[in-house]
Amino acid sequence: MLMPKKNRIAIYELLFKEGVMVAKKDVHMPKHPELADKNVPNLHVMKAMQSLKSRGYVKEQFAWRHFYWYLTNEGIQYLRDYLHLPPEIVPATLRRSRPETGRPRPKGLEGERPARLTRGEADRDTYRRSAVPPGADKKAEAGAGSATEFQFRGGFGRGRGQPPQ
């Protein structure tokens, strides 16, 4: 499909930066949501990715009216050559995630529970504690209970049933 070179470059840059591309299957959508600032139609994204897929540079998944494209190793090399990028720049999918550099937590509170529980958590905690006392026999308590005489009645609206005895 004929499309402006600036659109193709914008699509390839986003694909290389993220490593993945998502597009809704809607050829009439005026702009792709992630490339709205560059005025790239969704149709151009779909066709550019279809072209890369046919050459084996991306893998395609489709679910719930959305296309998902993942860069392959050959695709990374192709986009590096096409966009004239150095080998140090890699897609976000290949970068290692850093551990969170937040404030270290005090080590004294690891085994303790929080002092204040919400109502739902307190109810759940009480139920778990009082459900079965330690050392109790679960199998002896299971079953129909102490009633030895059972009475079977017909269901509601399923025939006439027997008269009560």
UniProtKB/Swiss-Prot annotation:
Annotated spans, Disordered: 92-165
Q: Which residues carry this modification: Phosphoserine?
A: S146
Q: What residues bear Symmetric dimethylarginine in this entry?
A: R158, R160
Provide a GO biological process annotation. Answer: cytoplasmic translation
Location of Phosphotyrosine modifications: Y12
Q: Which UniProt keywords apply?
A: Cytoplasm, Diamond-Blackfan anemia, Isopeptide bond, Methylation, Nucleus, Phosphoprotein, Ribonucleoprotein, Ribosomal protein, Ubl conjugation
| Compositionally skewed regions (Gly residues) per UniProt | 154-165
* Source organism superkingdom: Eukaryota
Please provide one cellular component term from the Gene Ontology annotations of this protein: nucleoplasm
Q: Where this protein primarily resides, as one coarse class?
A: cytoplasm
Q: Which residues does the record list as Omega-N-methylarginine (modified residue)?
A: R153
A Pfam family annotated for this chain is S10_plectin
Q: How does it assemble?
A: Component of the small ribosomal subunit. The methylated form interacts with NPM1.
Q: What disorder is listed for this protein?
A: Diamond-Blackfan anemia 9: A form of Diamond-Blackfan anemia, a congenital non-regenerative hypoplastic anemia that usually presents early in infancy. Diamond-Blackfan anemia is characterized by a moderate to severe macrocytic anemia, erythroblastopenia, and an increased risk of malignancy. 30 to 40% of Diamond-Blackfan anemia patients present with short stature and congenital anomalies, the most frequent being craniofacial (Pierre-Robin syndrome and cleft palate), thumb and urogenital anomalies.
Q: What is this protein called?
A: Small ribosomal subunit protein eS10
The species is: Homo sapiens
The taxonomy runs:
Eukaryota, Metazoa, Chordata, Craniata, Vertebrata
Q: What gene is this protein translated from?
A: RPS10
